[in-house]
Amino acid sequence: MELIIMSGRSGSGKSVALRALEDLGYYCVDNIPLALIPQLTDYLEKLKRSVVVSLDVRNLPEDPDVLEQVLHAFPSHISKTLIFLDCQRKALVRRYSDSRRLHPLSTHDLSLENVIDLENHLLEPLFQHADYIIDTTYFSSHELAEKLRELLNGSSEKELNIIVESFGFKYGIPADADYVFDVRFLPNPHWNLELRPMTGLEKPVIDFLENQSEVHQFISHTCNYLEVWLPLLEQNNRSYLTIAIGCTGGKHRSVFVAEKLARYIESKGKKVRVRHCSLEKHYKTS
């Protein structure tokens, strides 16, 4: 099991970091008391989940020895990593000024600069135990997310989850579609009485469409389009991309083309899922 403890200066980007790690599949818990972390890891270990816990200055024990004991109490089979987000004071002051949020320690009768210095002192034991220290002073949110992905995965590229779906225009365009391709101009198996009851998943329909040059040409051009633009979409920090292929009823052509495009994307090493939005409607009415 992997346990990542995320801490750092207030305003250094811990919330951004948690969102980025959640996108990577980690179970994230914000501001958990230090004493509860062992109980949480025991529970999640049974579920085979890796976890990220965020610690801020309010959840730390006053005695540094207690922190030391907790950090060294985890069993050896738990892979523990402590990441500390650092940031220069002038950048923290600017961020708090821009956001107009209160610092967690602002109840003290101190200026913001003095509160930041106090927090630095209180966080020093965590800083000393950190496996990785990331200075976020000049990072944008995207750059921090990329840094974390590079640190944990060995690559700054975010994995893009791609969904290829077929649909029928008669039922409406799927609301979640990022790209919509219209294949109603392709030869239609519907006009073949033997093929009409079948779907684009069945061999006679597949054979029919495989023999149409227009179908191959469309798939080839669409694959070329995706090959050019998918890398740029991945660099844009997207988590999901939905490609919708539509024909009249969502039964033959769109189903066949969606399957072909999904296999092509999969052959490029991408994570892809296929769903056929309108087939269920046909099964219900048949």
UniProtKB/Swiss-Prot annotation:
MF terms in GO: ATP binding; GTP binding
Residues that hold GTP according to the record: 56-59
Pfam families cross-referenced by the UniProt entry: PapZ_C, RapZ-like_N
Binding sites annotated in the UniProt record for ATP: 8-15
PANTHER family recorded: RNASE ADAPTER PROTEIN RAPZ
Protein function: Displays ATPase and GTPase activities.
UniProt xrefs under NCBIfam families: PRK05416.1
Keywords per UniProt: ATP-binding, GTP-binding, Nucleotide-binding
Family membership: Belongs to the RapZ-like family.
GTP-binding is among the record's keywords: yes
Organism lineage string: Bacteria, Pseudomonadati, Pseudomonadota, Gammaproteobacteria, Pasteurellales
Protein name: Nucleotide-binding protein HAPS_0087
InterPro entries found in the cross-reference section: P-loop_NTPase, RapZ-like, RapZ-like_N, RapZ_C
Disulphide-bridged cysteine pairs: none
